[in-house]
Amino acid sequence: FRTRQARPEPAISIKAEAFADDCSLIMPYDEGSIRAATEVLNRFSKISGLTINQGKTQVLKIGGAADMPDLAPDLGLKWVKELTILGINLMADPALTINNFEEKLGEVNSIFNKWQYRNLTVYGRIKIVKTLALSKLTHVVQIIPQLDEKRIKTLQKAVNDFIWKKGYQKKTVVDFETAQLPPWAGGLGIPNIGKFWDALQGNWIHRFFRAPDSCPWKRLAMRDLKTALHMPDLELSDLTSITPRKIGTHAGNISNPFWRKIWNNLQGYTESY
Protein backbone atom coordinates (compact mmCIF):
# COMPACT_ATOMS: atom_id res chain seq x y z
CA PHE A 1 0.00 0.00 0.00
CA ARG A 2 1.34 3.46 -0.87
CA THR A 3 0.48 6.72 0.89
CA ARG A 4 1.19 10.40 0.19
CA GLN A 5 0.36 9.83 -3.45
CA ALA A 6 -1.34 13.23 -3.48
CA ARG A 7 1.92 14.95 -2.50
CA PRO A 8 4.79 15.95 -4.78
CA GLU A 9 7.40 13.95 -2.85
CA PRO A 10 7.83 10.17 -3.41
CA ALA A 11 5.07 7.96 -2.05
CA ILE A 12 5.70 5.91 1.10
CA SER A 13 5.08 2.16 0.98
CA ILE A 14 3.37 0.70 4.05
CA LYS A 15 2.39 -2.88 4.76
CA ALA A 16 -1.07 -3.45 6.20
CA GLU A 17 -1.43 -5.36 9.48
CA ALA A 18 -4.33 -7.76 8.91
CA PHE A 19 -5.82 -10.47 11.12
CA ALA A 20 -9.01 -12.35 10.18
CA ASP A 21 -11.55 -9.64 9.36
CA ASP A 22 -9.56 -6.83 11.05
CA CYS A 23 -7.05 -4.61 9.28
CA SER A 24 -4.82 -1.87 10.73
CA LEU A 25 -3.22 0.84 8.60
CA ILE A 26 -0.55 3.33 9.68
CA MET A 27 -0.33 6.46 7.57
CA PRO A 28 0.63 10.13 7.88
CA TYR A 29 -1.83 12.80 8.94
CA ASP A 30 -2.84 13.64 5.39
CA GLU A 31 -6.30 13.79 3.83
CA GLY A 32 -5.01 12.61 0.45
CA SER A 33 -3.57 9.45 2.03
CA ILE A 34 -6.82 8.68 3.85
CA ARG A 35 -8.86 9.10 0.70
CA ALA A 36 -6.37 6.98 -1.27
CA ALA A 37 -6.61 4.19 1.32
CA THR A 38 -10.40 4.31 1.24
CA GLU A 39 -10.37 4.18 -2.56
CA VAL A 40 -8.12 1.10 -2.56
CA LEU A 41 -10.49 -0.68 -0.16
CA ASN A 42 -13.51 0.32 -2.25
CA ARG A 43 -11.89 -1.04 -5.41
CA PHE A 44 -11.07 -4.27 -3.60
CA SER A 45 -14.70 -4.62 -2.49
CA LYS A 46 -15.86 -4.51 -6.12
CA ILE A 47 -13.61 -7.48 -6.89
CA SER A 48 -14.11 -9.54 -3.74
CA GLY A 49 -17.63 -8.59 -2.72
CA LEU A 50 -16.32 -7.73 0.77
CA THR A 51 -17.31 -4.23 1.87
CA ILE A 52 -15.65 -2.21 4.60
CA ASN A 53 -17.95 -1.09 7.41
CA GLN A 54 -17.00 2.57 7.53
CA GLY A 55 -19.23 3.16 10.55
CA LYS A 56 -17.01 0.81 12.56
CA THR A 57 -13.76 2.05 11.04
CA GLN A 58 -11.85 3.95 13.73
CA VAL A 59 -9.09 6.50 13.22
CA LEU A 60 -6.65 7.46 15.99
CA LYS A 61 -4.40 10.50 15.61
CA ILE A 62 -0.99 10.06 17.22
CA GLY A 63 2.17 12.09 17.72
CA GLY A 64 2.05 15.73 16.69
CA ALA A 65 -1.29 15.19 14.96
CA ALA A 66 -3.09 14.16 18.17
CA ASP A 67 -4.75 17.57 18.61
CA MET A 68 -5.24 18.33 14.92
CA PRO A 69 -8.76 18.50 13.41
CA ASP A 70 -10.44 15.44 11.90
CA LEU A 71 -10.02 14.92 8.17
CA ALA A 72 -12.42 13.94 5.37
CA PRO A 73 -15.67 14.02 7.42
CA ASP A 74 -17.66 12.99 4.34
CA LEU A 75 -16.11 9.49 4.49
CA GLY A 76 -18.03 8.71 7.68
CA LEU A 77 -14.99 7.47 9.60
CA LYS A 78 -15.10 7.38 13.39
CA TRP A 79 -12.32 9.51 14.90
CA VAL A 80 -11.46 8.34 18.42
CA LYS A 81 -9.11 9.18 21.30
CA GLU A 82 -8.56 5.50 22.11
CA LEU A 83 -8.90 2.22 20.24
CA THR A 84 -8.41 -1.45 21.07
CA ILE A 85 -6.25 -3.81 19.01
CA LEU A 86 -5.77 -7.43 20.11
CA GLY A 87 -6.92 -6.62 23.63
CA ILE A 88 -4.61 -3.62 24.09
CA ASN A 89 -5.97 -0.09 24.45
CA LEU A 90 -3.92 2.36 22.39
CA MET A 91 -3.97 6.12 23.02
CA ALA A 92 -2.44 9.16 21.37
CA ASP A 93 -0.33 9.70 24.51
CA PRO A 94 2.00 6.68 24.97
CA ALA A 95 2.17 7.38 28.71
CA LEU A 96 -1.50 6.42 29.04
CA THR A 97 -0.84 2.88 27.83
CA ILE A 98 0.04 2.10 31.45
CA ASN A 99 -3.73 1.78 31.97
CA ASN A 100 -3.46 -1.61 30.24
CA PHE A 101 -1.33 -2.82 33.14
CA GLU A 102 -3.89 -1.69 35.72
CA GLU A 103 -6.57 -3.64 33.88
CA LYS A 104 -4.46 -6.80 33.72
CA LEU A 105 -3.44 -6.41 37.37
CA GLY A 106 -7.13 -6.54 38.24
CA GLU A 107 -7.44 -9.80 36.28
CA VAL A 108 -4.40 -11.23 38.09
CA ASN A 109 -5.87 -10.35 41.49
CA SER A 110 -9.15 -11.94 40.42
CA ILE A 111 -7.30 -15.20 39.67
CA PHE A 112 -5.58 -15.07 43.05
CA ASN A 113 -8.92 -14.52 44.82
CA LYS A 114 -10.44 -17.56 43.09
CA TRP A 115 -7.59 -19.81 44.19
CA GLN A 116 -6.76 -18.20 47.53
CA TYR A 117 -8.73 -20.60 49.73
CA ARG A 118 -8.01 -23.77 47.80
CA ASN A 119 -5.99 -26.34 49.70
CA LEU A 120 -2.81 -25.89 47.64
CA THR A 121 0.80 -26.41 48.57
CA VAL A 122 3.35 -23.64 48.09
CA TYR A 123 4.50 -25.40 44.91
CA GLY A 124 0.91 -25.51 43.66
CA ARG A 125 0.50 -21.78 44.28
CA ILE A 126 3.72 -21.04 42.42
CA LYS A 127 2.37 -23.07 39.51
CA ILE A 128 -0.83 -20.97 39.51
CA VAL A 129 1.25 -17.77 39.46
CA LYS A 130 3.34 -18.89 36.51
CA THR A 131 0.68 -20.54 34.36
CA LEU A 132 -2.49 -18.51 35.00
CA ALA A 133 -1.47 -15.14 36.43
CA LEU A 134 1.74 -13.95 34.77
CA SER A 135 0.60 -15.22 31.39
CA LYS A 136 -1.94 -12.36 31.50
CA LEU A 137 0.95 -9.90 31.31
CA THR A 138 3.20 -11.32 28.60
CA HIS A 139 1.49 -9.42 25.78
CA VAL A 140 1.20 -6.20 27.81
CA VAL A 141 4.96 -6.22 28.43
CA GLN A 142 5.55 -5.86 24.69
CA ILE A 143 3.30 -2.79 24.55
CA ILE A 144 3.98 -0.74 27.70
CA PRO A 145 7.27 1.16 27.22
CA GLN A 146 8.34 1.00 30.85
CA LEU A 147 6.83 -0.12 34.14
CA ASP A 148 7.68 2.03 37.16
CA GLU A 149 9.14 0.59 40.34
CA LYS A 150 5.96 1.22 42.35
CA ARG A 151 3.82 -0.96 40.07
CA ILE A 152 6.47 -3.69 39.98
CA LYS A 153 6.44 -3.78 43.79
CA THR A 154 2.62 -3.86 43.81
CA LEU A 155 2.55 -6.90 41.53
CA GLN A 156 5.39 -8.60 43.44
CA LYS A 157 3.49 -8.11 46.71
CA ALA A 158 0.35 -9.61 45.17
CA VAL A 159 2.36 -12.65 44.06
CA ASN A 160 4.08 -13.07 47.43
CA ASP A 161 0.83 -12.63 49.36
CA PHE A 162 -0.88 -15.30 47.28
CA ILE A 163 1.96 -17.81 47.60
CA TRP A 164 2.39 -17.29 51.35
CA LYS A 165 -1.36 -16.84 52.04
CA LYS A 166 -0.99 -13.15 52.98
CA GLY A 167 1.01 -13.99 56.10
CA TYR A 168 -1.33 -16.73 57.31
CA GLN A 169 1.17 -19.38 56.26
CA LYS A 170 2.21 -20.90 59.58
CA LYS A 171 5.77 -21.46 58.52
CA THR A 172 7.82 -19.61 55.90
CA VAL A 173 10.39 -22.11 54.70
CA VAL A 174 12.88 -19.63 53.20
CA ASP A 175 13.27 -15.86 52.88
CA PHE A 176 11.99 -14.09 49.77
CA GLU A 177 15.41 -13.68 48.14
CA THR A 178 16.22 -17.37 48.48
CA ALA A 179 12.71 -18.38 47.43
CA GLN A 180 13.22 -16.58 44.10
CA LEU A 181 16.22 -18.73 43.24
CA PRO A 182 15.63 -21.70 40.90
CA PRO A 183 15.05 -25.08 42.59
CA TRP A 184 18.47 -26.37 41.52
CA ALA A 185 20.00 -23.48 43.52
CA GLY A 186 18.00 -24.25 46.65
CA GLY A 187 15.08 -21.91 45.95
CA LEU A 188 11.43 -22.35 45.07
CA GLY A 189 11.44 -20.59 41.71
CA ILE A 190 9.10 -17.79 42.82
CA PRO A 191 9.06 -15.21 40.00
CA ASN A 192 10.93 -11.96 40.50
CA ILE A 193 8.60 -9.51 38.74
CA GLY A 194 11.30 -6.98 37.90
CA LYS A 195 13.51 -9.60 36.27
CA PHE A 196 10.49 -11.23 34.63
CA TRP A 197 9.56 -7.90 33.01
CA ASP A 198 13.13 -7.20 31.88
CA ALA A 199 13.52 -10.70 30.44
CA LEU A 200 10.37 -10.43 28.32
CA GLN A 201 11.41 -7.02 27.01
CA GLY A 202 14.85 -8.43 26.25
CA ASN A 203 13.23 -10.48 23.50
CA TRP A 204 13.30 -7.28 21.46
CA ILE A 205 17.07 -7.68 21.12
CA HIS A 206 16.43 -10.87 19.17
CA ARG A 207 13.77 -9.13 17.08
CA PHE A 208 16.11 -6.21 16.45
CA PHE A 209 18.80 -8.39 14.89
CA ARG A 210 16.35 -10.57 12.96
CA ALA A 211 14.17 -7.80 11.51
CA PRO A 212 14.93 -6.55 7.96
CA ASP A 213 17.03 -3.40 7.79
CA SER A 214 14.13 -1.70 5.99
CA CYS A 215 11.83 -2.19 9.00
CA PRO A 216 10.80 1.33 10.19
CA TRP A 217 11.02 0.64 13.93
CA LYS A 218 14.44 -0.96 13.51
CA ARG A 219 15.70 2.04 11.56
CA LEU A 220 14.51 4.37 14.32
CA ALA A 221 16.11 2.23 17.04
CA MET A 222 19.36 2.06 15.08
CA ARG A 223 19.34 5.82 14.54
CA ASP A 224 19.01 6.48 18.28
CA LEU A 225 21.76 3.97 19.05
CA LYS A 226 24.12 5.64 16.58
CA THR A 227 23.48 8.99 18.23
CA ALA A 228 23.98 7.60 21.74
CA LEU A 229 27.29 5.93 20.81
CA HIS A 230 28.45 8.95 18.76
CA MET A 231 28.99 6.61 15.82
CA PRO A 232 27.04 8.00 12.83
CA ASP A 233 28.43 5.34 10.46
CA LEU A 234 27.56 2.42 12.74
CA GLU A 235 26.31 -0.69 10.93
CA LEU A 236 24.39 -3.59 12.44
CA SER A 237 27.37 -5.92 11.98
CA ASP A 238 29.53 -3.50 14.00
CA LEU A 239 27.51 -4.13 17.16
CA THR A 240 29.17 -7.50 17.65
CA SER A 241 32.50 -5.74 18.20
CA ILE A 242 31.12 -3.31 20.80
CA THR A 243 30.96 -4.59 24.37
CA PRO A 244 27.55 -4.74 26.08
CA ARG A 245 29.04 -2.64 28.89
CA LYS A 246 29.84 0.20 26.47
CA ILE A 247 26.38 0.08 24.93
CA GLY A 248 24.80 0.06 28.38
CA THR A 249 26.95 2.99 29.49
CA HIS A 250 25.79 5.13 26.57
CA ALA A 251 22.17 3.92 26.72
CA GLY A 252 21.31 6.84 28.99
CA ASN A 253 21.66 9.14 25.98
CA ILE A 254 18.75 7.44 24.19
CA SER A 255 15.54 9.49 24.40
CA ASN A 256 13.18 6.55 23.85
CA PRO A 257 12.55 5.08 27.34
CA PHE A 258 11.71 1.64 25.94
CA TRP A 259 14.99 1.16 24.07
CA ARG A 260 16.99 3.01 26.69
CA LYS A 261 16.09 0.39 29.26
CA ILE A 262 16.64 -2.55 26.91
CA TRP A 263 20.13 -1.42 25.86
CA ASN A 264 20.94 -0.56 29.46
CA ASN A 265 20.10 -4.17 30.43
CA LEU A 266 22.12 -5.66 27.56
CA GLN A 267 25.05 -6.69 29.74
CA GLY A 268 22.70 -8.44 32.15
CA TYR A 269 21.12 -10.33 29.26
CA THR A 270 24.51 -11.54 28.01
CA GLU A 271 25.69 -12.54 31.49
CA SER A 272 22.55 -14.62 32.02
CA TYR A 273 23.68 -16.80 29.13
Language-model-derived ranges and their functions:
Residues F1-A18:
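Active-site nucleotide-donor binding segment shared across nucleotidyl transfer reactions
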Residues F1-R4, S33, A133:
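Conserved pre-motif C helix in the palm subdomain of viral-like polymerases
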Residues R7, I52-L83, T97:
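Short, conserved micro-motifs composed of acidic
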Residues I14-K46, G63-A65, A92-L96:
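Catalytic palm subdomain of template-directed nucleic-acid polymerases
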Residues D21-C23, F44-S45, G49, V59, ...:
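Mobile genetic element proteins and their domesticated derivatives, centered on retroelements
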Residues L41, I152-I163:
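Short amphipathic alpha-helical coiled-coil/interface segments
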Residues D74-L147, W164-K170, L200-C215:
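Basic, alpha-helical interaction scaffolds
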Residues L155, K171-Y273:
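Extended C-terminal regions of large enzymes
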